[in-house]
Amino acid sequence: MQICLMDETGATDGALSVLAARWGLEHDEDNPMALVLTPQHLELRKRDEPKLGGIFVDFVGGAMAHRRKFGGGRGEAVAKAVGIKGDYLPDVVDATAGLGRDAFVLASVGCRVRMLERNPVVAALLDDGLTRGYADADIGGWLQERLQLIHASSLTALTDITPRPQVVYLDPMFPHRQKSALVKKEMRVFQSLVGPDLDADGLLEPARQLATKRVVVKRPDYAPPLADVATPNAVVTKGHRFDIYAGTPLTE
């Protein structure tokens, strides 16, 4: 995949070359999208809209730390949707990981989550965030146990993941209507990179075959159900709904 690769660390250790080789990235000086190594983290920038700033994954500080400490925890809609109850903490495959926010929420309340991400740039951002998270004295211990990244296409990986999870979580890219500055900023940068998930409808059936209990699909409230398969079961919040579909139980 072609992208502009930039190093602002001031180091001469060849980290950029290692990054490119690991994720199959090719430097393109004229690409409007840039993957930038800064002294703090790896970030994605839209060079023709510098005011949007950089997008990076941070499990330790910022909004994620606030959500972990002061958010709803088990009461969050995504936690309710995957079925967390009492001692039941399902094993989850997040097949459209993105920046890992919902996966992190589930991990922070006790679920083991395997994140799938097919875009190599997004996977590199996630990996960078995980590396810093794993090294953190506060959250590193449980984060290493509960949150992992698999760089693979969901369409192929969903057919051969083992062991099978109890829940598959899907949050395909869908054009956002929200006017919030953060969503607009992130979505503009993100959609410039990955575009809409045109093959997202093809995820529902393999997800239902893989999950032993349920599939949860996050949708904006104005979006049709994934693959036009309606379900009466959903957790509804302001602006979103989490559609719930039956999985395929394990056979003895």
Curated annotation (Swiss-Prot):
Subcellular localization, as worded in the UniProt entry: Cytoplasm
Reactions accelerated catalytically: guanosine(1516) in 16S rRNA + S-adenosyl-L-methionine = N(2)-methylguanosine(1516) in 16S rRNA + S-adenosyl-L-homocysteine + H(+)
Binding site for S-adenosyl-L-methionine: R101, D102, E117, R118, S153, S154, D171
Matching Pfam families: SAM_MT
Keyword match Cytoplasm: yes
Domain of life: Bacteria
GO molecular function: rRNA (guanine-N2-)-methyltransferase activity
Listed SUPFAM superfamilies: S-adenosyl-L-methionine-dependent methyltransferases (SSF53335)
Family matches, as InterPro entries: 16SrRNA_methylTrfase_J, SAM-dependent_MTases_sf
EC number(s) given by UniProt: 2.1.1.242
Keyword line: Cytoplasm, Methyltransferase, rRNA processing, S-adenosyl-L-methionine, Transferase
Signal peptide range: none
Any single Gene Ontology cellular-component annotation: cytoplasm
Family under the similarity heading: Belongs to the methyltransferase superfamily. RsmJ family.
Role of this protein: Specifically methylates the guanosine in position 1516 of 16S rRNA.
Protein name (Swiss-Prot/TrEMBL): Ribosomal RNA small subunit methyltransferase J
Provenance organism: Salmonella paratyphi C (strain RKS4594)
Source taxonomy: Bacteria, Pseudomonadati, Pseudomonadota, Gammaproteobacteria, Enterobacterales
